[in-house]
Amino acid sequence: MSEERTAWGWGLASVDAAGTTLDVWYPELNLGEAPAESDRPNHNFGTLAHDEADARGIRRVPVFVVSQLDEPISNAADAYLKLHLMSMRMAKPNTLNLDGIFAQLANVVWTNYGPFAVEDFTLRKADVERASTEAALAFASQAGLPAAAPAATVNVFGVDKFPRMIDYVVPTGVRLGDADRVRLGAYLSSGTTVMHAGFVNFNAGTLGVSMVEGRVSQGVVVGDGSDIGGGASIMGTLSGGGKLRNSIGEHSLLGANAGIGISLGDNCTVEAGLYITAGTKITIWDKAKAAAGEPLEVVKGAELSGKDNILFIRNSVNGRIEARYRKVGIELNAKLHKN
């Protein structure tokens, strides 16, 4: 019988007027068996925690959470703990049981003032802006400054179940061109650069130094030294009911506006604009057979999934998709990844 894996820690939960947990922030987490209640360390949230609702209608409540990593998600606090574990690099993608995560997470209005409940957002937005303006006027009066107050504006980043990673976890050695395009639960190894058009979903990410200019879908992992070109995409498991998790090996390149519905092994390249799925018919290039006029083998993309040293191209003369042997993989520019 395998030993149960657990993680634990103090979180600060945002709870709305209906008692719904909108988010939980964990500044620190621990792996292993949780201490007994009498041995638990104290939290250090101080005045960040408040049991009286603020202008958003939100209370911030300290919660001590123990997560069973191999069990389905039990509640929102459990979901946020597992998402934090991945973004903190304490658990790699596809190693935690995330079953039920969508059902346990509330849809939230994410703003520069923190999370709001969707149901009463318009009224709460006015309350926050009014309270902020009044506080600014009071400060100006006490400081002997002109009475004009800057306009306090609630800016909405999105309405979603998942927040931006960067508001909860800032991993070291990483560059992010646009914070909105990396969800909490993304795993970004040191040396990763996510450009402005890149996107990394939760339970997905990079296992080494990587360049991400395209989309890394849920469940997808990218190996060390690989490059996801601008506009490129990798099929995930959230849409269409698919169960197969695709991945990219080391020193591989998914060209600009290319895409895959299969896994790439090490030292592979998919040329720009080429999309390969499991059912794509691919011709195996053989120079000797071609010279002798013999027919070339044709296979489905699924048969090449995960294999190393392949160059996938579309023959510009006859239009067929070909797989050719490739001796070496790509090398990233080291200067771009000293983060």
From Swiss-Prot:
Protein name: 2,3,4,5-tetrahydropyridine-2,6-dicarboxylate N-succinyltransferase
Pathway assigned to this chain's UniProt record: Amino-acid biosynthesis; L-lysine biosynthesis via DAP pathway; LL-2,6-diaminopimelate from (S)-tetrahydrodipicolinate (succinylase route): step 1/3
GO CC terms of this entry: cytoplasm
Active site: residue positions: E213 (acyl-anhydride intermediate)
Catalytic reaction annotation: (S)-2,3,4,5-tetrahydrodipicolinate + succinyl-CoA + H2O = (S)-2-succinylamino-6-oxoheptanedioate + CoA
Annotated localization: Cytoplasm
Chief location category: cytoplasm
GO molecular function, a single term: 2,3,4,5-tetrahydropyridine-2,6-dicarboxylate N-succinyltransferase activity
Function of the molecule: Catalyzes the conversion of the cyclic tetrahydrodipicolinate (THDP) into the acyclic N-succinyl-L-2-amino-6-oxopimelate using succinyl-CoA.
Origin species: Bifidobacterium longum (strain NCC 2705)
Subunit structure: Homotrimer.
Pfam families tied to this protein: Hexapep_2, THDPS_M
UniProt keyword Cytoplasm present: yes
GO terms of biological process kind: diaminopimelate biosynthetic process; lysine biosynthetic process via diaminopimelate
Keywords: Acyltransferase, Amino-acid biosynthesis, Cytoplasm, Diaminopimelate biosynthesis, Lysine biosynthesis, Magnesium, Metal-binding, Transferase
Source superkingdom: Bacteria
Residues annotated as binding succinyl-CoA: R215, G230, S233, A256, E271, A272, G279, K300
Transmembrane segment boundaries: none
Positions of Mg(2+) binding: D180
Keyword Magnesium appears in the UniProt entry: yes
Family stated for the protein in its record: Belongs to the type 2 tetrahydrodipicolinate N-succinyltransferase family.
Enzyme Commission designation: 2.3.1.117
